[in-house]
Amino acid sequence: MLFATLEHILTHISFSTISIVITIHLITLLVRELGGLRDSSEKGMIATFFCITGFLVSRWASSGHFPLSNLYESLIFLSWALYILHMIPKIQNSKNDLSTITTPSTILTQGFATSGLLTEMHQSTILVPALQSQWLMMHVSMMLLSYATLLCGSLLSAALLMIRFRKNLDFFSKKKKNVLLKTFFFNEIEYFYAKRSALKSTFFPLFPNYYKYQLIERLDSWSYRVISLGFTLLTIGILCGAVWANEAWGSYWNWDPKETWAFITWTIFAIYLHSRTNPNWKGTKSAFVASIGFLIIWICYFGINLLGIGLHSYGSFTLPI
């Protein structure tokens, strides 16, 4: 009872905090004068991270196994993985270009886990025999970490395509001298202001196009780095799953629906990484491939849970009506 109460408190505190954080985050991106609120949003993200970590530890202690046995627990872990991605650039003292991807992704993931699932799904359950293995934590955690990473990379690529094909990209409002950001994106506001100040006394007629190009290059670089990490994690997760499958079912690969879609996901991102070796495919073309991967990941993650079929159907669920 104590653990259940603690978990309930932690999840609702974290969800409320992240809701406030994303509101502050959007305001600071749009209005430079309120940039001081950025520190508050980062503190909120840290507080939320510790709440989610506390929930996972509490659930682990109460259930006796790592909390990855159903869809609810996996969604909470997925949001926790997104927090990790959010914090990595901060640890490296670099600009957090991922924040506008990770923050809303986290609130949507956690919001669906908290409010979109039946209450029964929130309860910890006894593991079925096939899941009572030391491979549970290794395989499932690697897969979810790869999903979180690949989703962020795919969204960065999708953002690149949106900017690339937008005809008129006006970064700044003409009405104010202090300059307001009209199209908010990835904390680039600080970068834009610094560059604009440096070029204030020079003639630069192609200023908007120049920064459009710079932003596209930056997104392309970040997308490639994030997807490379996610692809590595996905490969490790699939290999761990194959070993576990051999122990549990006597076969490394059964072409179960989940396995099939995991293979499709792996193939899509392998194509993306291979396309990067061709200079003509860097940028827009490879970003298109990565954007397709965004849809494939969600099919792989939710597909079996929605259908409730196959060897990976332990976490299947029914949406509340």
From Swiss-Prot:
One of its GO terms (cellular component) is chloroplast thylakoid membrane. It is a multi-pass membrane protein. GO terms for molecular function: heme binding. It is found in: Plastid, Chloroplast thylakoid membrane. It comes from the Eukaryota. InterPro entries: Cyt_c_assembly, Cyt_c_biogenesis_CcsA, Cyt_c_biogenesis_CcsA/CcmC. Keywords: Chloroplast, Cytochrome c-type biogenesis, Membrane, Plastid, Thylakoid, Transmembrane, Transmembrane helix. The chain crosses the membrane at residues 9-29, 44-64, 68-88, 143-163, 226-246, 260-274, 289-309. One of its GO terms (biological process) is cytochrome complex assembly. Required during biogenesis of c-type cytochromes (cytochrome c6 and cytochrome f) at the step of heme attachment. May interact with Ccs1. Belongs to the CcmF/CycK/Ccl1/NrfE/CcsA family. This is Cytochrome c biogenesis protein CcsA.
